[in-house]
Amino acid sequence: MKVIVVGMGVQGVKRKKYLGNDFVCSVDKYKKADYSSIVDVPLKSYNSVLLCVPDNEKIDIIQYCIKNKKNLLVEKPLFIKSNKILINLEKKAKKNKVILYTAYNH
């Protein structure tokens, strides 16, 4: 598995620490990271994403990952104003055979 960590706050730093050789790079537009945007990371370099960003940034990144067939572990909460959006994301993930999982781990 080749994993990128998006969001280098407390959870992103913790998750990076445990990835070992599976870690590819970090992405964060506010903090020191390898890239400031996920779109700059070469798609062939990874197959999974650990998403540890604020809620207002999650949907766009999730959609990008699903479109590009990248598996996702989303740090909770995954708060969205409309269940329709969640249902649509789930359908797209299934269609693209992408694992989309929300978790809470400390």
Locate predicted features.
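Short acidic low-complexity segments
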Residues: A33-Y46
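Beta-strand-loop-alpha-helix segment that lines the small-molecule cofactor/substrate pocket
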Residues: S48, I59-Y104
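N-terminal Rossmann-like dinucleotide-binding module
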Residues: M1-A33
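Alpha-helix boundary recognition
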Residues: K17-G20, P42, K94
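Local beta-strand N-terminus motif with an aromatic residue
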Residues: F23, Y46-V49
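Residues at the C-termini of beta-strands that transition into short coil/loop
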Residues: V27-Y30, V39, Y104
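Substrate-binding/gating loop at the entrance of the active-site cleft, primarily
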Residues: P54-D55
